């Protein structure tokens, strides 16, 4: 009965996900651009407390009223976290935004911080209180289990990460258009080689635009045929040579590989 209720809830949630009140501006701007405010309403800012202040460290995606999806490498057991929702500019008070404490963190059991290229860079955060959905706070859709996007499929990475290698940290949410690089290409020796696994998804690699420091844990947003946006990736890692390095696309945890894990964690917690 509990499982039936959960599945019903997930299905009901899926009917009202990935469809922003304020649709994003989908352009081909090279180098990224400021996002339309609240056009990625599942995007969250994961923040940690230090000396009485809160600091942005990673992105994440709201996938249920009480659950946020992020990267395992964003999590440190010694830190206290909260999640900022409905945000655009992280440094001004914004109407309709929320800050909610994290009550539980579930990191994938096979994640190893010393071997990031082995994958499983995924974590779920349970919020201390479920959030009410508004025009500025909405749920992300997740793709069907096992979905593989074709080469050159257009997606958008979003976050408050650095604008370029060693560059400035933006106040407002940024978006960048990235084309998916298929596994055969991304795992070739001229690209990422054996560092990339089938449980990952690559996007970018043109030497111009990519995810960067501070984007980690955030979504790779890809539009489905029905017009809804699905989070296909979680920002995982990039090249030590720089954020925008040629033939070193951003590497994401492939969400469709972990749908069963996500549902299991939510069902049991």
Swiss-Prot record:
User: EC class of this enzyme?
Assistant: hydrolase
Q: Where is the Peptidase S1 domain?
A: 29-267
InterPro entries attached here? Peptidase_S1_Elastase_sf, Peptidase_S1_PA, Peptidase_S1_PA_chymotrypsin, Peptidase_S1A, Trypsin_dom, TRYPSIN_HIS, TRYPSIN_SER
The reaction(s) this protein catalyses = Preferential cleavage: Leu-|-Xaa, Met-|-Xaa and Phe-|-Xaa. Hydrolyzes elastin
The record's EC number reads: 3.4.21.71
Which Gene3D superfamilies does UniProt cross-reference here? Trypsin-like serine proteases
| Biological function | Elastase that enhances insulin signaling and might have a physiologic role in cellular glucose metabolism. Circulates in plasma and reduces platelet hyperactivation, triggers both insulin secretion and degradation, and increases insulin sensitivity.
Protein name in the entry: Chymotrypsin-like elastase family member 2A
Native source species: Homo sapiens
Lineage, please? Eukaryota, Metazoa, Chordata, Craniata, Vertebrata
Q: Which gene encodes it?
A: CELA2A
